[in-house]
C-alpha cells in the first residue's frame, strides 16, 4: 500500500519474479498463518490543473527503506495515536503526512474529499487499511521533499505516470497503478472532485494468488478471486 512500513523478520518473502504491474511490492512478506490486523493509514492524492488539466503529485520513498524502498507513491502514512478514531483520524493523518512528506499545508480536514479505501491482502504480513483522499494544491504553495523518507517528488498526469512506470523510469506498486488507471479517465480536477463527492466508497481488499514462484494480485470480480 501507499502507507509506509517495515518488513517483518519472520515469514517468507513473496516471489520476486511477479509481473510488476500486478504483483506485490518487493520486500513484502508472505503470511502463511492467520491474517494480521491491518494498521489504519491515510494517503493524499494532491491535484493541480485548470479546467482541462489534471496533474497529481507522486513522491519517491528513500531507497534506504526496507519496505517499498525507491517506490513512487502518493504521500501518506499510518494514523498516529491521539489522532482520534474513524474518519476524523484518517483525515488528521492525511493532513499531517502531506505536510511532513511534501511541505504542503492544507487548510484542514475539510479540504479533503474521500476517494477510496484499500486494504492490504490477508496473505501479506504487513497490512494497512488505507483511506485515500483527494485534495487540491493550495494557492501559493509548492511541494518540497523532506530529505528523509521522501527523496524526490514530481507532478504527473495519470497517463504520464503509467508510461514512466512502463518505461522503467519510476517504480510503482499495484494500488498506485490501479488508482492511476482510474484517474486517467478524468480530464480535469473539477470533474474528478465532482465525481468523488458523489461516490459511495467501498473497501477494496485484493488477494494474492501464488502460482509456483509467481505471485499475482487479484481484485474483486477477477477470475480466481
Where in the sequence are the language-model features?
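N-terminal leader/linker segments that precede catalytic domains of diphosphate-processing enzymes
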Residues: 1-150, 154-225
Amino acid at each position: 500500500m501507499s502507507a509506509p512500513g517495515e518488513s517483518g523478520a519472520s515469514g517468507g518473502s513473496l516471489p520476486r519474479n511477479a509481473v510488476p504491474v500486478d504483483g506485490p511490492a518487493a520486500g513484502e512478506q508472505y503470511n502463511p498463518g492467520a491474517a494480521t490486523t491491518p494498521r489504519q493509514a491515510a494517503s493524499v492524492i494532491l491535484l493541480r490543473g485548470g479546467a482541462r488539466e489534471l496533474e497529481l503529485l507522486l513522491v519517491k520513498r528513500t531507497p534506504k527503506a526496507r519496505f517499498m524502498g525507491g517506490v513512487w507513491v502518493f504521500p501518506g502514512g499510518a494514523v498516529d495515536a491521539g489522532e482520534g478514531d474513524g474518519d476524523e483520524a484518517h483525515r488528521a493523518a492525511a493532513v499531517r503526512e502531506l505536510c511532513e512528506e511534501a511541505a504542503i499545508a492544507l487548510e484542514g480536514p475539510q479540504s479533503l474529499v474521500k476517494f477510496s479505501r484499500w486494504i492490504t491482502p490477508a496473505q501479506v504480513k504487513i497490512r494497512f487499511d488505507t483511506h485515500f483522499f483527494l485534495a487540491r494544491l493550495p494557492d501559493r504553495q509548492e511541494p518540497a521533499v523532506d530529505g528523509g523518507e521522501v527523496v524526490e517528488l514530481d507532478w504527473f498526469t495519470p497517463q504520464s505516470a503509467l508510461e514512466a512506470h512502463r518505461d522503467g523510469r519510476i517504480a510503482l506498486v499495484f494500488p498506485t497503478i490501479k488508482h492511476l488507471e482510474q484517474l486517467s479517465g478524468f480530464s480535469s480536477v473539477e470533474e474528478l472532485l465532482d465525481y468523488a463527492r458523489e461516490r459511495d466508497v467501498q473497501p477494496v481488499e485484493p488477494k494474492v494468488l501464488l502460482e509456483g514462484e509467481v505471485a499475482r494480485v487479484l481484485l474483486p470480480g477477477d477470475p480466481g478471486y
